Amino acid sequence: MSLVYMNIMTAFTVSLTGLLMYRSHLMSSLLCLEGMMLALFVMATLTILNSHFTLASMMPIILLVFAACEAALGLSLLVMVSNTYGTDYVQNLNLLQC
């Protein structure tokens, strides 16, 4: 495994660890998710370029589309929660409350 792949896997692991450890605020969770998606995008792009697999060349672009949709939904949820509750604490979000 080359140094580039190890750095990308380290970035993904650090983002995943940040998501698991610092999940008290919704904004920090969204930033960690974006870091994970960026690492997945770079890993998919490098894998496709190195293997010369031209049939899967659209896969990183599709991944970016889903990442943009995820970011838009996450930010709209952040705005809705901060307007409703005044904070962005994840502990305040309970689906069992009316």
UniProtKB/Swiss-Prot annotation:
Gene3D superfamilies: 1.10.287.3510. GO terms for biological process: ATP synthesis coupled electron transport. Its main location: mitochondrion. It catalyses: a ubiquinone + NADH + 5 H(+)(in) = a ubiquinol + NAD(+) + 4 H(+)(out). It is a multi-pass membrane protein. Its EC number is 7.1.1.2. It is an enzyme of class 7 (translocase). GO terms for cellular component: mitochondrial inner membrane; respiratory chain complex I. Keywords: Electron transport, Membrane, Mitochondrion, Mitochondrion inner membrane, NAD, Respiratory chain, Translocase, Transmembrane, Transmembrane helix, Transport, Ubiquinone. It is found in: Mitochondrion inner membrane. The chain crosses the membrane at residues 1-21, 29-49, 61-81. GO terms for molecular function: NADH dehydrogenase (ubiquinone) activity. Core subunit of the mitochondrial membrane respiratory chain NADH dehydrogenase (Complex I) which catalyzes electron transfer from NADH through the respiratory chain, using ubiquinone as an electron acceptor. Part of the enzyme membrane arm which is embedded in the lipid bilayer and involved in proton translocation. PANTHER family: NADH-UBIQUINONE OXIDOREDUCTASE CHAIN 4L (PTHR11434:SF0), NADH-UBIQUINONE OXIDOREDUCTASE SUBUNIT ND4L (PTHR11434). Core subunit of respiratory chain NADH dehydrogenase (Complex I) which is composed of 45 different subunits. Belongs to the complex I subunit 4L family. This is NADH-ubiquinone oxidoreductase chain 4L. The lineage of its organism: Eukaryota, Metazoa, Chordata, Craniata, Vertebrata. The gene is MT-ND4L.
